[in-house]
Swiss-Prot record:
One of its GO terms (molecular function) is ribosome binding. Residues 22-34, 91-100, 158-166, 219-225 are cytoplasmic. Residues 59-68, 127-131, 190-196 are lumenal. It comes from Danio rerio. It comes from the Eukaryota. The gene is tmem147. This is BOS complex subunit TMEM147. The chain crosses the membrane at residues 1-21, 35-58, 69-90, 101-126, 132-157, 167-189, 197-218. The keyword Hydrolase does not apply. Belongs to the TMEM147 family.
């Protein structure tokens, strides 16, 4: 039963990545090693972020239940390094915009999935007692995939030299939402005392809204050129 539960969680977490890779056409471009390189860039960026946070933002030692608003906001600002990393990956790949976006997003999201959720699923989902948090973790990995695709698309649009002036403000707002989405979610959970399933639903809705706006801007920009 525990192995069956682990199989369900593993399939729910990993198969959407495999399906996205196959259906997006990346397999036809032999982009596997490009995605691996993007994943390696993610690991380097994450290491730099961890060193920076450990050096300049030590562990919060405030009272129980006290939310360090300024500290968490500054920590979230460090996630701007992800924007630089995605831009670096896309600038090193030749091809159409959608190809660059998918390579960067797939490599980035897959590396995060392996580093953040592989071991917890392997250790926890095979436990004797059933726990919904591993199902939630699997759903969250799918949300992260959508998030990174949207983020890569926004970064690609923001770095275009021919970006129309009317697009600059919406794209900048989307960049800010991509960077501070995690901070906003933590703030919502703390203020409104959201449960785990409610927080996951809010995160999915917020990610979906950002993704739809990014898709609309991307399609409009591509067709206008």
């Amino acid at each position: 039963m525990t192995l069956f539960h682990f199989g369900n969680c593993f399939s729910l977490a990993y198969f959407p990545y495999f399906i996205t890779y196959k259906c997006s056409g990346l397999s036809e471009y032999n982009a596997f090693w490009r995605c691996v390189q993007a994943g390696a860039t993610y690991l380097f960026v994450r290491l730099c972020k961890m060193l920076f946070l450990a050096t300049f933002f030590p562990t919060w030692e405030g009272g129980a239940g006290v939310y360090d608003f300024v500290g968490e906001f500054m920590k979230a600002t460090v996630d701007m390094a992800d924007l630089l990393g995605l831009h670096l990956v896309m600038s090193r790949n030749a091809g159409k915009g959608e190809y660059k976006i998918m390579v960067a997003a797939m490599g980035w999201a897959t590396a995060e999935l392996i580093m953040s959720r592989c071991i917890p699923l392997w250790v926890g989902a095979r436990g004797i007692e059933f726990d919904w948090k591993y199902i939630q973790m699997s759903f969250d990995s799918n949300i992260s995939l959508v998030h990174y695709i949207a983020m890569a698309a926004v970064v690609w649009m923001f770095t275009r030299y021919d970006l129309p002036k009317s697009f600059r403000l919406p794209v900048a707002i989307l960049l800010g939402l991509c960077v501070y989405k995690g901070f906003l979610m933590e703030l919502f959970v703390h203020v409104f005392l959201l449960g785990s399933w409610t927080a996951l639903l809010v995160k999915a809705v917020l990610t979906g809204a950002i993704s739809l706006c990014s898709l609309f801007l991307f399609v409009t920009l591509v067709h206008s050129n």
